Amino acid sequence: MDLEKKAAPRGRPRLITQERIADAGIEIGLPNITFVGVASALGVTHMALYKHVPSLAELKHMVAEEIFRRWEFSLPKVGVHEGLQDYLVRFSDSVREFAKTYPGVTPYVIRRLVATPAMLEKIDAHQQEVAQAYRIEKDQSRQLLATIAFHGLAAADSVYSAARQETVVQTSFEAETAEMEGDLAQGMHALIAGALLQLQLDPALKP
């Protein structure tokens, strides 16, 4: 869907564009998105928004896709002598932070079969860049990054969803997340070490 094609009237900026819809959705947060809420943020009626986006499901998918598009993947630091394992740990941390920053985004980005061509292209380019930087096979890079992203997103989503649940015990979001983040990091380190071992790759491999 191309919301930008129709020319806006002279002197008046368009109120409904894909970028503005995404900005409003990100501000509201995926779990709280409604047609009325996004329309209100854009300064239009919800019926006007319906003319551009036919369903709530498509509206949420549009916002999630834009969140993913804006995500700047952690890339190898050529010349810094960062080992492959250290890089993968840093990438894992960025995956966790992504899930924490954007509650509700995980179901839209973890399933390859519902990913858009643009999302798949971005993933492929990242895998290719890591393969070239560390001089490993593209399929090895794909297995490493896909494994870390999948399990990192799934686990982080569970951690932060659990921390946001009401409990009968007095606690704080910060205290709960700090404890669970430590366990998550430990588990991801073990996953990374195991993935490198399975692929017979040197953890200290430098770019």
Segments from the language model and where they lie:
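Amphipathic alpha-helical segments used for helix-helix packing
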Residues: 96-124, 157-167
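Hydrophobic alpha-helical connector segments
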Residues: 73-105, 110-112, 148
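Short, amphipathic alpha-helix enriched in basic
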Residues: 5, 12-37
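HTH DNA-binding helix-turn interface
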Residues: 29-30, 43, 50-61
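Key DNA-contact positions within bacterial/archaeal DNA-binding proteins
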Residues: 36, 45-48
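Short, basic, alpha-helical segments at the C-terminal edge of helix-turn-helix-like DNA-binding modules
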Residues: 65-72
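C-terminal peripheral helix-coil segments that are non-catalytic and often amphipathic
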Residues: 1-4, 161-207
